[in-house]
């Protein structure tokens, strides 16, 4: 992996290129549908990709600090063939991902964050997720309302774990500092 990072006042930039070669990837496999699934080291994978992130802080009108972060990542997986007919978990890594976050402070007590993620996995599944958080700070307490997956998107993350649909949280934090 090799990368470049630039930080100056209210602007930041990160760029990284990487290459990873892995062998003996574990998957549950079988040669016919009558056989039980067996965990086996079955594959080799060569992965290359890059990540790019930009961030900018600024002030807008009567609002306090505003922050915009934008990121893009691209991953290319080269899978070597397996000798098994059936695989329980097809390797399904991220292929392309765009992220954007906008954080704004209304005043010294109120702030909000809007987060956007658009992703494409190697099985060509594409999805978009939007999250929102608003927080109110009073003395040592912070009360937040969090809305996750506002679009109620059905999608899976790492290891094909299905992620929850739309959900909301109320969070109360106390700082002992």
Where would I find each of the regions flagged by the language model?
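Transmembrane beta-barrel outer-membrane domains
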Residues: 8, 33, 43-47, 63, ...
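Outer-membrane beta-barrel translocator domains and adjoining extracellular loop/strand segments
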Residues: 17, 25-33, 75-87, 115-116, ...
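Residues on the lipid-exposed face of transmembrane beta-strands in outer-membrane beta-barrel proteins
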Residues: 2-6, 52-56, 100-104, 132-136, ...
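C-terminal beta-signal and adjacent terminal beta-strands/loops
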Residues: 121-123, 131-177
